[in-house]
């Protein structure tokens, strides 16, 4: 057999493998060349190392060179290699040693071209002819026995080489090692003394071995292979104590073992010798267990474990010996012991075989003798049958001990013929003769098997892999796009696609992970249906045309793939030709339900010819949903021109002619939302007012026309009701009467509308003036309400305020308006007398309440707030300081410069500007009646409360078209804050300062109340209304100059005087007119100027003259505001 290695090389440099096929090595490493290449500069080599480290790979030729030889050796004996890595040689062959790192095996070269491993103890440094040492080695003392066989010749070879001797002069190798072995091991190995001369060469060392393995190998080489093999194994795997015989007997051999019991291991000692087997646990205090060799039923080994089965008593052991060699040694010892025991039985067998007429039998069951003529036998024991004819039930037998007796014949089985006995004897002989070599052969076979396995794996790994057909290679991608591979399709089995990659590796990928394009490719190539593995999102997102195309493709694929299998099957029925799936998709059915419906139609063998006859009842029987039934029926009606009025299409299963829950008698879907919309129109609160107050806007008949609209086809339903509903709603038309209606209703609630003010005004002033004023007042809110439709919420919000404070204010204000001449003075007197406190509560209450009664309840809150604001009239000096300084004089000038129309449009400005006009006597005040101003203020305040721009109010107020919205937008914001904070202080001053109407002190209370009402959004309206009512008489009595003069004088004075003077003096002067104001509120009818005015003066003389004199007022107002700020409180912010 050729050598495995082709050369030995040494590495010149370090090299790191770059691929799996390459080999990593370091400098000066030994490499065994396995293959030479003539095409490139890469060689296949094996890296030298311990056994089991078979590192094989490619190495670059430029990185290695032939390894130098270490020394020269010679073969001492003939040797035939056992594996392909070893080398066969003859005695005396010259060997070149390249690697001697292993003490038992050398890597050598023979003849310059054969490389391999050889046993180290089969070689020597000198040729066999040059070694005379064996003759001299015999008389050497025992102490020199451990010297190796080649050691005595080494110094002779170096110092004085001897001429070669004839071969017959050199004794045979076994004779050289026999004397020392006999003297040394005679006592330790008596059992193995037999047949020591069978083998002369030294034993084979273990192939895998390191530097430590050779330390325990005997150096003398004496003894036969059996003794040497056992001793070497023991010395290599056991401690030195284990090699020594036990103290009880020199023939016992012991090994430390571990008994395996489940997951536990217990230390113990196993001893074999003298025909006995003993087992002694380490922690046991009693006697060790022992069995004779005949009780050993079975023994075997597996790697490091030895299994023993005994009888008498029956016990089984699983022993762990630490290494496989130790386990083999124990098995070897047991085999020798069992062979020695069986040798005596074999002699008896031979004697029985040679004896005539005697048969051999085997005991099947254990039998204990109970009589004198009986004999005890054990199960499995061989006995001689002496007589089996005397009795059929009892046979005379003789056991192995020579004791004869009778045993039941059923307990004995006759042994086979003599041929069988001879075969048994031969087997026993062979077993005893070959058992000594079992361990050695087993280890050698294991090594050979391992090498063969490694070679096979290496060859399989190195074998070139098959490549796929380049024409079938394509790029495959998974569904996520992260995995891509170039491979050819092998097939699709069990939901997996088998691919052959370009590198030769074959893989299988689940169909559910592959992209849709790849699945379609597999379907086209293999004909396998993979629709279930495709994602559902594709079906949802794709168009119906794509889904039909995919379905048709799958149908064609199924038909093509099943053509061969369906050759013997009946021909497909015509129903399979019609695409029910596409039909339902065209009808608008959900894609998930299409397949289920298609399966039902196909299962019932329905084709396209039955479509004209399909009715809703047929569709229901096939499991279609109601909505899908309507879609399919509609599609069929359109396709075949059916009217859709027949019972087949419109009548449900139950035969209800009135239609179903969702469809009418015509089969069309019902518009259930139309009824709801109709009810919404009926329940609209504004619509009821529209119907009552705006008859021309009512459109009930169109609402009644909706039922016939429902009877129209489904397509016409959405348009018809949509056109009529906006006509019914007409938010603008109903809202206008709604707003005016709410105001009119509040006005017409009229405990107040009989308006004593109107009667008083008629008596006080010319009725002609009052009538146009009232007409304007009623008309203006109407127009204003039309523009302010969204302000209904404001009215609703004001209503609760009116209920609480209005009623009180109304009660208080009604007498103020009716007896405006008589009761007015009283009210004003209480207000003035109360000073600042009494004025806001009493004075303004009466004034705004009178106006508020006419005004809707929404402005009642203004009266309450107006009460506080008129209280500010008492503190007219305070407001003058803050408001008059900032806005009073300036605003007055602006108001004078700007037309009163603009100020009136401003809302609260409205009340203030007219007062300025009245005070100054300007034609503007006379031109625009106060009622109009107040009436406009009310809608404006409503709008203001609704936070709508005052511009809309101005637009709504036709009377004040001349008044621009600018003053209202500019001034009201500032006065609101100032006047609102100064509610407790007199509102006249606060309102006047922001609105510039403060100079009109005679109208201070109402004007300021108007300004405050603008700030308070609610109160100003009431006050303005009340004031407006009062002002109405003033306007009617515009010719009354005396009343206007007091207003004009202080107002002019305030205007003429510098701004600082307005702060001080105007307040003083204003108090003088303020007394007039008190009389004016009583005489707000101005027609009563004579009588109530006098009353007002008297009131002023009573309270103001004594406490609020003209001159004392200046220090009081200015001083209190400036000096008492330190004593300000939340209720008295200015420290009055």
Curated annotation (Swiss-Prot):
Cited SMART domains: SH3
The keyword Amino-acid biosynthesis appears for this protein: no
Highest taxon of the lineage: Eukaryota
GO CC annotations on file: actin cortical patch; endosome membrane; nucleus; plasma membrane
Family named by the database record: Belongs to the SLA1 family.
Subunit structure: Component of the PAN1 actin cytoskeleton-regulatory complex.
Job description of the protein: Component of the PAN1 actin cytoskeleton-regulatory complex required for the internalization of endosomes during actin-coupled endocytosis. The complex links the site of endocytosis to the cell membrane-associated actin cytoskeleton. Mediates uptake of external molecules and vacuolar degradation of plasma membrane proteins. Plays a role in the proper organization of the cell membrane-associated actin cytoskeleton and promotes its destabilization.
Basic and acidic residues composition bias: residue spans: 533-545
Molecular function in Gene Ontology: actin binding; identical protein binding; protein-macromolecule adaptor activity; ubiquitin binding
Protein name: Actin cytoskeleton-regulatory complex protein SLA1
Annotated source species: Yarrowia lipolytica (strain CLIB 122 / E 150) (Yeast)
Record keywords, A-Z: Actin-binding, Cell membrane, Cytoplasm, Cytoskeleton, Endocytosis, Endosome, Membrane, Repeat, SH3 domain
Cross-referenced Pfam families: PH_SLA1, SH3_1, SHD1
Region span, Disordered: 143-251, 423-475, 532-573, 640-739, 775-810, 928-1011, 1024-1136
Topology of the protein relative to the lipid bilayer: Peripheral membrane protein
Gene3D superfamilies noted in UniProt: SH3 Domains (2.30.30.40), SLA1 homology domain 1 (2.30.30.700), Transcription Factor, Ets-1 (1.10.150.50)
